[in-house]
Curated annotation (Swiss-Prot):
GO terms, molecular function: undecaprenyl-diphosphatase activity
Cross-referenced InterPro entries: UppP
Highest taxon in the source lineage: Bacteria
This protein's record includes keyword Zinc: no
Top-level taxonomy: Bacteria, Pseudomonadati, Campylobacterota, Epsilonproteobacteria, Campylobacterales
Record's keyword annotation contains Ion transport: no
Localization of this protein: Cell inner membrane
Protein's recorded name: Undecaprenyl-diphosphatase
Designated gene of the protein: uppP
Residue stretches spanning the membrane: 1-21, 42-62, 71-91, 96-116, 134-154, 173-193, 211-231, 237-257
Enzyme Commission number, as recorded: 3.6.1.27
Keyword annotations of the record: Antibiotic resistance, Cell inner membrane, Cell membrane, Cell shape, Cell wall biogenesis/degradation, Hydrolase, Membrane, Peptidoglycan synthesis, Transmembrane, Transmembrane helix
Length: 258
């Protein structure tokens, strides 16, 4: 992996981690276009750049996270289902990883996004929840439970949680914001658990630490931009463009990678 490869992959991770388009699918597609094989080194690199993206959420919402205890309770409630299922089914989840599965999930969840938005337009929700304060513990649990679907590669963690938020009565911007915040405990836990389970592989790749840190820093900067732009976008528009994009990128995946 070259410096240019590290920068490109960091940009892709930062742009796609919090958009409902599957960062995993985009990283696989990009790696294929760069002629990078799915090696242990690349897997370690992806863990590090994911950490960079998580830190961007912490930075963006730092003041809210620092002072809002109720929000933390909701995030913990949302995190628990994923933590339990992820711990129990870790090996099985990892065995699901395949490029074909990624393509199927890109298409399936793309269609789901389109259908959910069309149904919302036909039957607008009453008493939409407009703020994070309005989210109940029950809704937080339901949204957190939806993260379990995202364990299947190509689903998109943000995609699953945003759809669950919309179905729970949250408006688009609040659904996105809670999805981003829920990533903090979820992705920190996943990152550290992955690092622990693969500690020998990480130790063997310490020669690449500078590339890893470069990619993580790039992902952090790009994710800062992506989070702010995405929240502005969904305050004005719906999620149908993302559903269409997922389907298009699935076909690109089939053409360039499979």
């Amino acid at each position: 992996m070259s410096i240019i490869d590290a920068v490109i992959l960091g940009i892709v991770e930062g742009l796609t981690e919090f958009l409902p388009v599957s960062s995993t699918g985009h990283l696989i597609l990009t790696a294929g276009l760069l002629n990078l094989e799915q090696t242990d080194t690349l897997k370690c690199f992806e863990v590090v750049i994911q950490l960079g993206s998580i830190l961007a959420v912490v930075f963006t919402f730092f003041e809210r996270l620092k002072r809002d205890k109720q929000l933390w309770i909701k995030l913990i409630i949302g995190f628990l289902p994923t933590a339990a299922i992820g711990y129990l089914l870790y090996s099985h989840i990892k065995s699901l990883f395949s490029q074909n599965v990624v393509v199927y999930m890109l298409i399936i969840w793309g269609v789901i996004f389109i259908v959910v938005e069309l149904l919302r337009k036909k039957n607008p929700p009453e008493n939409e929840i407009l703020t994070l304060d309005g989210i109940s513990y029950k809704q937080a649990f339901f949204i957190g439970l939806s993260q379990c679907f995202a364990m299947v590669p190509g689903t998109s963690r943000s995609g699953a949680t945003i759809i669950a938020g919309l179905l729970s009565g949250l408006n688009r911007q609040t659904a996105a914001a809670f999805s981003f915040l829920l990533a903090v405990p979820t992705m920190f836990a996943a990152t550290f658990y992955d690092t622990y389970k693969n500690r020998e592989i990480f130790a063997a790749n310490m020669d690449n630490i500078q590339l890893f840190l470069l990619g993580g820093f790039v992902a952090f900067l790009v994710a800062l931009f992506a989070i702010k732009m995405f929240l502005k976008f969904v305050s004005r528009f719906d999620y149908i463009p993302f559903g269409i994009y997922r389907i298009l990128i699935a076909f690109a995946f089939m053409f360039f990678v499979l």
